[in-house]
């Protein structure tokens, strides 16, 4: 029996407290940076408790996820640069979240004026505007250094005391607005507590993180197996990074993940007919998630292939299909309605409106006319774009370990390989007999077709409203958009049942275990042990390499 197993619970907790307090005192006396001190104060107790509770955490993916996501997420929120544009369109998300928290007439500060500006980094960064031909990258590379954080935080704290009221008539509730509610809750709480600017900003990030953790945890509870797939997705560096910032992507991906998991959970219980509650667990999260990026609605095609055996009667299945169609039409109208009401004129993507220069010619109506005049030409443009979008190198480089404008961490290729191996291990091995039989050919093909269409429709939208008229390319489709349907691919499309688990254990884990010392062989052949060890390692590597070692 391991020595830690014989210790009482109070003693284990007492040792964890000591592992937090003693390093804090020692590192403070040595004058270490606060980030280094905070990392060890959190990491050492967590590492000790992980060892003490390893059997419980290994056998429960839900607990393992919470045990890893909460401390690493909190550290990421604390280490994040103050400027909100560190994440994709963070300045837009922050302003809307502020307006939700305070209303149309809201109190703003001089610091907010910086955070509302896409180029605010030049105000708080180390390199002034115009210093060189490329002063954007050096500013982001230096923002996490000790000097960079000290200057930025000092500037924000100084300007955060300068307040004035603003009436912004441009704010209006829309379908995408709700995606900023988690951030807004933290800002509202900061106002309620009278928190200083930097703390208020932290609270907005914290509530978004907690909302993401809640959605991922709920998704795991809906499944009989495949929970480790969801755990690995929930701890992907790019997704946790967005959850710790001002972004509506955690809302979108999180609700879609919950909808997908609920759907797969129903398939894993073929003996239980679909109930009203079960249907709502699928349709409500899916709708809330896809509303944020409505052009991705074709990806819901898989919903129509829920097998007849899940319904008590044929009429019940007809009602299910009608409900899915109503959801699809409603979501489609949220982006097609405004476009059609303008007669197809102007821009269909608001980001296109910022591209106003002599070299830019963006007009949806004119673009649509050219597409109708020569549809085969546009079809070729779409095919070429889609093939390029599936280029493995950008996917490897940007989909797993990406912190937006921050410079790439050291060893990021090796780190990315680790994330891919973890996802592959969970996808192939976290399968039970509950996964055998239900992935019918029709369901799998329907899901694949829906996913392909869900990326073609946004591409068409971006061609209409974000790309020059008559261009032979499509702008605006980012690799990170693949995260929307990545959970569906791993949970459903790539489900081979227990066959894949048996193959990996026989051909991969078994041979690896034979090369290890005898005492380690049982753990090396156990999926739960291998997954928990690799997931824990990658979660803490995310903080160490992402925010400490490279500086």
Q: Where in the sequence are the language-model features?
A:
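Start-transfer (signal-anchor) and selected internal transmembrane alpha helices
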Residues: 2-20, 26-81, 319-325, 438-441, ...
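Transmembrane-helix signature of polytopic, membrane-embedded enzymes
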Residues: 9-16, 63, 195-198, 217-237
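Membrane-interface alpha helices of multi-pass inner-membrane proteins
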Residues: 24, 241, 275-294, 299-305
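Short acidic/glycine- and proline-prone juxtamembrane loop motifs at membrane-interface regions
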Residues: 35, 245-252
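Hydrophobic alpha-helical membrane-interfacial segments at the cytosolic entry of transmembrane helices
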Residues: 67-71, 279-286, 311-337, 445-453, ...
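Interfacial juxtamembrane loops and adjacent helix segments
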Residues: 104-201
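Perimembrane helix-loop-helix junctions
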Residues: 262-271, 297-329
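Membrane-lumen/periplasm interface segments of multi-pass, membrane-embedded glycan/lipid transferases
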Residues: 337-434
């Amino acid at each position: 029996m391991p020595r830690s197993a014989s210790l009482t619970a109070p003693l284990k907790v007492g040792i964890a407290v000591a592992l937090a307090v003693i390093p804090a005192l020692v590192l403070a006396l040595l004058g270490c940076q606060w980030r280094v001190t905070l990392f060890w104060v959190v990491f050492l107790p967590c590492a000790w408790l992980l060892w003490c509770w390893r059997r419980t955490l290994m056998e429960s993916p839900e607990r393992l996820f919470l045990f890893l996501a909460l401390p690493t997420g909190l550290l990421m929120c604390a280490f994040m640069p103050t400027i909100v544009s560190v994440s994709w369109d963070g300045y837009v998300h922050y302003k809307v979240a502020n307006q939700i928290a305070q209303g149309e007439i809201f109190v703003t500060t001089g610091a907010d004026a910086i955070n509302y500006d896409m180029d605010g980094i030049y105000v708080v960064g180390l390199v002034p505007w115009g210093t060189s031909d490329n002063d954007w990258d050096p500013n982001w590379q230096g923002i996490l250094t000790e000097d960079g954080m000290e200057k930025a935080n000092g500037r924000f704290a100084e300007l955060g005391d300068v307040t004035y009221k603003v009436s912004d008539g441009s704010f209006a509730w829309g379908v995408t607005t709700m995606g900023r509610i988690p951030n807004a809750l933290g800002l509202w709480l900061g106002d309620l507590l009278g928190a200083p600017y930097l703390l208020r900003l932290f609270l907005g990030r914290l509530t978004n993180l907690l909302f993401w953790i809640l959605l991922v945890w709920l998704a795991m509870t809906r499944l009989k197996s495949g929970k480790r797939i969801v755990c690995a997705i929930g701890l992907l560096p790019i997704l946790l990074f967005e959850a710790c910032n001002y972004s509506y992507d955690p809302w979108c991906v999180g609700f879609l993940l919950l909808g997908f998991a609920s759907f797969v959970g129903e398939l894993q219980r073929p003996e239980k007919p679909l109930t009203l509650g079960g249907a709502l667990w699928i349709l409500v999260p899916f709708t809330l998630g896809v509303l944020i990026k409505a052009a991705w609605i074709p990806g819901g095609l898989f919903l129509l292939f829920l097998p007849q055996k899940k319904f008590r009667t044929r009429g019940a299945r007809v009602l299910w299909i009608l409900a899915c169609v109503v959801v699809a039409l409603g979501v489609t109208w949220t982006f097609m309605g405004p476009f059609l009401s303008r007669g197809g004129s102007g821009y269909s993507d608001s980001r296109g409106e910022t591209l106003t220069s002599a070299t830019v010619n963006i007009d949806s109506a004119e673009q649509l006319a050219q597409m109708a005049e020569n549809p085969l030409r546009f079809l070729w443009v779409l095919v070429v774009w889609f093939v390029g979008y599936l280029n493995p190198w950008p996917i490897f480089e940007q989909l797993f370990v990406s912190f937006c404008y921050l410079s790439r961490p050291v060893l990021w290729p090796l780190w990315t390989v680790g994330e891919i191996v973890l996802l592959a291990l969970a996808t192939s091995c976290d399968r039970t007999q509950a996964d055998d039989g239900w992935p019918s050919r029709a369901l799998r093909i329907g899901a694949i077709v829906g996913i392909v269409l869900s990326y073609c429709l946004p591409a068409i939208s971006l061609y209409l409203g974000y790309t020059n008229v008559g261009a032979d390319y499509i702008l605006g489709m980012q690799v990170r958009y693949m995260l929307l349907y990545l959970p569906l691919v791993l949970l459903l499309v790539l489900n081979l049942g227990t066959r894949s688990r048996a193959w990996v254990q026989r051909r991969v884990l078994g041979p690896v275990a034979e090369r290890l010392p005898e005492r380690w062989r049982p753990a090396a052949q156990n999926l739960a042990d291998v997954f928990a060890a690799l997931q824990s390692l990658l979660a803490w590597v995310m903080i160490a390499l992402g925010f400490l070692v490279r500086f």
